[in-house]
Amino acid sequence: DFTAMTFTVNGSEFNYGKVNLRQRAHGEELYWDILKWVSDMREKCEHDGSQMERLETILTDYYYGNFSVFQSLPDLWAIDQIFPVMPIHRLKEKPTRNAVLSDITCDSDGKIDKFALADGISRSLPLHDPEIEKGQEYMLGIFLVGAYQETLGDLHNLLGDTNVVGVH
């Protein structure tokens, strides 16, 4: 059970001084390595689907974007509409991470966690590791948004207008 493993890693051993910071870091590194290994092995083994779904949730990264879900995508949170999202560069590289997208507004409550993929709706989006190209922004596109989204969203925060690129 992955919940028990999480409790052991994040449990009270460190809080009560039984494990130092270096030991805790090593334990967490082992924990994430084991979960990644189990995830990689899942196709080769019979498994409990609910546990694998939980594992995928645990291994999903958060990618923070400089936008507001509430301003730029009101239909996403208001009527649960799913918009196509994908990287707009590094297209010749295979994505190596699974992530959800979160905004960086005053409350950071905006999150995109449903994605249209070729095989259906997914709770995470395959993305590239942004650390590979240090100093360069990782660019994503959100498509089929429609002009009225910006009007519905209003300019209610400090981020200003949504950037738009026209591709012909």
Stretches found by the model and what they are:
Residues 1-168:
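Charged (often Lys/Glu-rich) extended helix/loop segments that serve as interaction or gating elements
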